Structures are given as C-alpha cells and as structure tokens.
Curated annotation (Swiss-Prot):
Keyword Ribosomal protein among record annotations: yes
Lineage per the UniProt record: Bacteria, Pseudomonadati, Pseudomonadota, Gammaproteobacteria, Oceanospirillales
Xref: HAMAP family: Ribosomal_bL21
Annotated GO biological process: translation
Functional description taken from the UniProt entry: This protein binds to 23S rRNA in the presence of protein L20.
Any single Pfam family the record assigns to this protein: Ribosomal_L21p
GO cellular component, one term: ribosome
Protein name: Large ribosomal subunit protein bL21
Keywords in alphabetical order: Ribonucleoprotein, Ribosomal protein, RNA-binding, rRNA-binding
Domain of life: Bacteria
Keyword RNA-binding: yes
GO MF annotations in UniProt: rRNA binding; structural constituent of ribosome
PROSITE patterns: RIBOSOMAL_L21
C-alpha cells in the first residue's frame, strides 16, 4: 500500500515504514504528524485518485529528527569588474517515519 501526499509544496510517494526528509515541520522529535492532503491511495489493484484530494484519506507519521541539509554554495560575480560575492545556504528538514495510511 502506498500514497502520494503533499508537504511543503512538494509531492511525495510514501509507503508504511518508510523514512523520508520533508521541509521543516514545527513538531517536536517523537511527535506525531498527520497529512490530510492525500492525492492518491493505492492498495494493490484498488487505486483511489483524488480531485484534488482523496476524501477521508490520512497518512500518519512520527517525527524522527530535525536537521539541516548539506551546504549549497552560491557565487555571484560581475564580469570584468573584479567583484565577487560568495554565499551559502543550508535548508532545514524534518525526518519522519510513516506509521500508517488510511483511506
């Protein structure tokens, strides 16, 4: 059984017991998160596609950890002017473990 959920403006295909990194969610470690924006639920040959979401479908997950991704380096420069600006960015994430899919 798998489902497609929306979290942080992105769509994720999830299965029960799977761990994945999502955009930062304001829930403490060990807490439970419920995703009600479920776009698709599939159980073998029984596939339910929402328009836009599947009514009554829900995915529950447990928050495992919070952290930051690897650093992304950004370089801006102006040609022929000897001007360069170096910047970096590290995006926050929340790692969750999918505990249940209903619907």
């Amino acid at each position: 059984m798998y489902a497609v959920i929306v979290s942080g403006g992105k769509q994720h295909r999830v299965k029960e017991g799977e761990r994945l990194k999502l955009e930062k969610i304001e829930v403490e470690t060990g807490g439970v998160v419920e995703f009600d924006k479920v776009l698709l639920v599939a159980n073998g040959d029984d596939v339910k596609v929402g328009a836009p979401v599947v009514e009554g479908a829900k995915v529950t997950a447990e928050v495992v950890a919070h952290g930051r991704h690897k650093k992304v380096n950004i370089i801006k420069f102006r040609r022929r002017k000897h001007h360069m600006k170096r910047m970096g960015h590290r995006q926050w994430f929340t790692e969750v473990k999918i505990t249940g899919i209903t619907g």
